[in-house]
Amino acid sequence: MCLSLGQRCGRHSNCCGYLCCFYDKCVVTAIGCGHY
């Protein structure tokens, strides 16, 4: 199961496809999200 845009995420949760976890929220990878 993956998390959608804007959902809270953590070290052990995965955001869906093109999203990544940034400051505890799933955001679009293009914004830039460190190396997660």
Curated annotation (Swiss-Prot):
Membrane-traversing stretches: none
MF-aspect GO terms: ion channel regulator activity; toxin activity
Keyword line: Disulfide bond, Ion channel impairing toxin, Neurotoxin, Secreted, Toxin
Tissue-specificity statement: Expressed by the venom duct.
Organism: Conus betulinus
Any single Gene Ontology cellular-component annotation: extracellular region
Name used for this protein in its record: Conotoxin Bt11.4
Secreted in keyword set: yes
InterPro entries on file: Conotoxin-I_CS (IPR013141)
Sequence similarity: Belongs to the conotoxin I1 superfamily.
Domain remark text: The cysteine framework is XI (C-C-CC-CC-C-C).
SS bonds (residue pairs): C2-C16, C9-C21, C15-C26, C20-C33
Location(s) in or outside the cell: Secreted
Main location: secreted
